[in-house]
Amino acid sequence: MIVPKEKIEEAVKQALSKENNPKRGFTQSVELIIAFKDVDMKRGDIKLREAIVLPKPPSKPRNVLVVPSLEQMESAKRAEPNVILSKEELQKLQGAKRAVKKLASKNQWFLIAQDSMSLAGRILGPSLGPRGKFPTPLPSSSDVSEYILRYKRSTLVKTKDQPQTQTFVGTEDQPSGDLAENVFAVLNSIEGKIKGPAYIKAIYVKTSMGKPVQINLK
């Protein structure tokens, strides 16, 4: 365990306080920042690209774009993703750079039927890559509703060339205890992939426009 849950909740409460989080005219995201030490990112000491299901779903689900197969279409609709496209509709986006960029900006996850993955890579890839996003293949089963629902409550933890990662863990209107559970779930999921707590320099919680609050690791 990297840090006890009660210390996480203490930091979450501070991050949500008026002192650190002045009221805005919209519901802010709550983010977790993990800074690493004694690692060489260019050498690949830490490589993270993990989809982690949040145990306490955010009040607003993650936006998911889905391109199901014909057999998966009805079950995909039941999950009510943000955007659902047929393979033919995806094909029609070829060359529509503005529309593709808009889809890339507004959605967090891109779940694609396996027979449409190469097409999605060609059409969506150029807009997804610079945003740190990527197509994820749907399973081959005909019922993909539960799979899509899981991604509507999932967050992405990824690293690039900097020794840190920043990820969504909920929204400011959630109870602090729920947010703490989500932070705990993320830390628990990546603990085995970062060579242990000794490589963590600091962990912070913050709202999207608020001040970061450091979690006490001692």
Curated annotation (Swiss-Prot):
Q: Does the keyword DNA-binding apply?
A: no
A single Gene Ontology MF term assigned here is: tRNA binding
* InterPro entries reported for this sequence: Ribosomal_uL1 (IPR002143), Ribosomal_uL1-like (IPR023674), Ribosomal_uL1/biogenesis (IPR028364), Ribosomal_uL1_3-a/b-sand (IPR016095), Ribosomal_uL1_arc (IPR023669), Ribosomal_uL1_CS (IPR023673)
- Does the record bear RNA-binding in its keywords? yes
Sorted UniProt keywords: Repressor, Ribonucleoprotein, Ribosomal protein, RNA-binding, rRNA-binding, Translation regulation, tRNA-binding
Q: Which Pfam families match?
A: Ribosomal_L1 (PF00687)
The UniProt entry's GO biological process terms, in alphabetical order, are: regulation of translation; translation
The terms describing its cellular component in GO are: large ribosomal subunit
Name the family: Belongs to the universal ribosomal protein uL1 family.
Q: Which PANTHER family match?
A: 54S RIBOSOMAL PROTEIN L1, MITOCHONDRIAL, LARGE RIBOSOMAL SUBUNIT PROTEIN UL1M
Q: How does it assemble?
A: Part of the 50S ribosomal subunit.
What does the function comment of this entry state? Answer: Binds directly to 23S rRNA. Probably involved in E site tRNA release.
Q: What is this protein called?
A: Large ribosomal subunit protein uL1
